[in-house]
Amino acid sequence: MQRLVLVSILLCANFSCYPDTFATPQRASIKALRNANLRRDESNHLTDLYQREENIQVTSNGHVQSPRFPNSYPRNLLLTWWLRSQEKTRIQLSFDHQFGLEEAENDICRYDFVEVEEVSESSTVVRGRWCGHKEIPPRITSRTNQIKITFKSDDYFVAKPGFKIYYSFVEDFQPEAASETNWESVTSSFSGVSYHSPSITDPTLTADALDKTVAEFDTVEDLLKHFNPVSWQDDLENLYLDTPHYRGRSYHDRKSKVDLDRLNDDVKRYSCTPRNHSVNLREELKLTNAVFFPRCLLVQRCGGNCGCGTVNWKSCTCSSGKTVKKYHEVLKFEPGHFKRRGKAKNMALVDIQLDHHERCDCICSSRPPR
C-alpha cells in the first residue's frame, strides 16, 4: 500500500500536476505502466522506466509535447502517441521552433530522442529520429492515416526545452492533372505558431521530378529562390553553419566554404572534353597482316556525359567537333621468317596517322549541332 502511494505521488510530481503535459484534449485513450521493480541510483533517484501510451483520434488541430515543455523533461521516460485520422486523410506534423534534447553520440541518437514512424497494415516506416539542439526537425506529411510518435529519455542527462509537435489532418485527394512541381505555400496556425507547408491538394514531389527541377538551375541561389522565395537567404546561410550532428568528415577538414556553383559549372564545362584514350593500332588501322610495337598508343578522344544534370542531358552524346590527324613513329612487323643475322626485311620503323579530337561538342536529339 505504501508503494502505491509513493508511485502516485511521483506520478503527480512528474506529470499530472503539469497542465497540458502530453496532448491537447481530443478523443484519446491512455495506458500507463511503471515497472514493478523500482531501482534507485547512487543519488537516490528512481531509475526504472516510466512508460505511457496514448491513442489520439485526429479530428482537428492539436499538439503533443515532452513533459514540462519548455523546461527540462524528466528522466527515464518512454512515451508513445498513436495518431489516427479518418480514412482518405493524412496527418501533418510540424515541430515547434523551440527544440532541444540530449546531444547525439557519434551522430547517433542513442539516449534521449523523439522518433516518428508511419504505420500501415503491411509495414512501418521510420520517418526520422532526432535529438540535440542544432536543427529543428522538418515538417512531415504522412502517406497513411496513422503515425506513431515515440519519446525516450534515459537516466542520465536531460535537456530543455524538449519538444512540441503540432498535428493536423489533411485531405488525401490529388487533382488528376496536377503538375509535379506546382507548389503552393499555405499557412496553418496552432496556438499562435505559424509554419508554411505545401498545398494539401498538390502531390508529393517525387525524386525524379525534383531531379528535373534541380537540373534547370545553374546556381544554388537560383535553386533556393525557386523552392523558398521568401526564406531563401536564410536557407543559404544555414547551409554553411557548423552543425556537426549532420556533417561528414569532408565538412570539418576543409578550411573554407565549398563553392557549389563552381563544382556545378566544372561538370558542365569539362564533362564533354578531349581526354587520353588508348587505341590498339591493329584495330585502329584495320590491319590484319601487320603487328606494331608499341601495340597501343594514347590519343585524344572525346568522352564524358555532356554535363550530367543539364536539361535533356540523357539524350545527348559527346562527339568530336574538330578532328585532326597526327603522325606517330612505331616499329612495324610483318608475318614471315625472321633472320637471326643480318637486316630483317619484314621489320621497319614507319609513320602512321591517328585521329585526335581537338574539340568536343554535345550532340542532342532536341537541338542541331553547333
UniProtKB/Swiss-Prot annotation:
Choose one Gene Ontology CC annotation of this protein and give it. extracellular space
Q: Name one Pfam family in it.
A: PDGF
One example of the protein's molecular function in GO is:
growth factor activity
Q: What is its main location?
A: secreted
Coiled coil, from the record? none
Modifications the protein undergoes after translation, according to the UniProt entry: Activated by proteolytic cleavage. Proteolytic removal of the N-terminal CUB domain releasing the core domain is necessary for unmasking the receptor-binding epitopes of the core domain. Cleavage after Arg-247 or Arg-249 by urokinase plasminogen activator gives rise to the active form.
Q: Where is the signal peptide?
A: 1-23
Q: Which tissues and organs express this gene's product?
A: Expressed at high levels in developing heart, lung, kidney and some muscle derivatives. Moderately expressed in liver, brain and testis. In the kidney, localized to glomerular mesangial cells and vascular smooth muscle cells. Up-regulated in areas of renal fibrosis. In mice with unilateral ureteral obstruction, expressed in interstitial cells at day 4, with an increased to maximal expression at day 14.
Gene Ontology annotations of biological process type: cellular response to amino acid stimulus; cellular response to hydrogen peroxide; cellular response to platelet-derived growth factor stimulus; cellular response to transforming growth factor beta stimulus; positive regulation of cell division; positive regulation of fibroblast proliferation; positive regulation of glomerular mesangial cell proliferation; positive regulation of monocyte extravasation
Q: Which UniProt keywords apply?
A: Cleavage on pair of basic residues, Developmental protein, Disulfide bond, Glycoprotein, Growth factor, Mitogen, Proto-oncogene, Secreted, Signal
Subcellular location(s) per record: Secreted
Q: Which domain of life is it from?
A: Eukaryota
Outline the extent of the CUB domain: 52-170
Instruction: Provide the residues annotated with a glycan attachment (glycosylation).
Output: 276
Q: How does it assemble?
A: Homodimer; disulfide-linked. Interacts with PDGFRB homodimers, and with heterodimers formed by PDGFRA and PDGFRB.
What this protein is reported to do is described as:
Growth factor that plays an essential role in the regulation of embryonic development, cell proliferation, cell migration, survival and chemotaxis. Potent mitogen for cells of mesenchymal origin. Plays an important role in wound healing. Has oncogenic potential and can induce tumor formation. Induces macrophage recruitment, increased interstitial pressure, and blood vessel maturation during angiogenesis. Can initiate events that lead to a mesangial proliferative glomerulonephritis, including influx of monocytes and macrophages and production of extracellular matrix.
The entry assigns this protein to a family as follows: Belongs to the PDGF/VEGF growth factor family.
- PANTHER family in the record, alphabetically? PLATELET-DERIVED GROWTH FACTOR (PTHR11633), PLATELET-DERIVED GROWTH FACTOR D (PTHR11633:SF4)
The name this protein goes by in its record: Platelet-derived growth factor D
Q: From which source organism is this entry?
A: Mus musculus (Mouse)
